[in-house]
Regions:
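Charged interaction scaffolds used for protein-protein
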Residues: 1-11, 31, 37-51, 72-128
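Residue-level signal for threonine
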Residues: 22
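Short, hydrophobic/amphipathic alpha-helical patches that form generic packing surfaces
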Residues: 55-66, 106-109
Length: 128
């Protein structure tokens, strides 16, 4: 369904979901936190446990829905329903959410990594 180099997979209930950082997700995160660079700080500084859980649930929902949105874009005749925050809350437990933090970090890393390739003929090659 999705390029696995871009995704981190989690299980919610009986379903697997790919967490993907797309441009759309980045815009949503920026709107909520002011940018990706502020995300970790905001999650760590959540005023209370309930608020921290709510932020993690929101983030999982946003990232998991990216793979569904991509699927729906490619399969307009057979779209899947988007995951809701309520579904994430009901189908997970706090231990799951702690484990998902690793997947969230992985998805964010994969979404922001840069592939740097060296040219075969370097401009700074030794001249003979």
């Amino acid at each position: 369904m999705v390029d696995k180099d871009r995704a981190a997979t989690i299980r919610i209930g009986d379903e697997e979901y790919d967490l993907i950082l797309t441009t759309k997700a980045t815009k949503e995160i920026a709107g909520r936190y002011g940018g990706l660079e502020n995300l970790g700080e905001k999650l760590l500084k959540a005023e209370n446990f309930e608020m921290a859980l709510g932020e993690i649930v929101w983030l999982i929902t946003v990232l998991a829905n990216q793979s569904i949105l991509i699927f729906n874009l490619r399969n307009k005749d057979n779209p899947k329903e988007l995951l809701t925050e309520e579904e994430v809350e009901l189908l997970t437990n706090p231990l799951d959410l702690a484990e998902y933090k690793v997947a969230i970090t992985d998805a964010l890393f994969k979404g922001t990594k840069r592939n740097i390739e060296s040219e075969a003929d370097s401009k700074n090659a030794k001249v003979e």
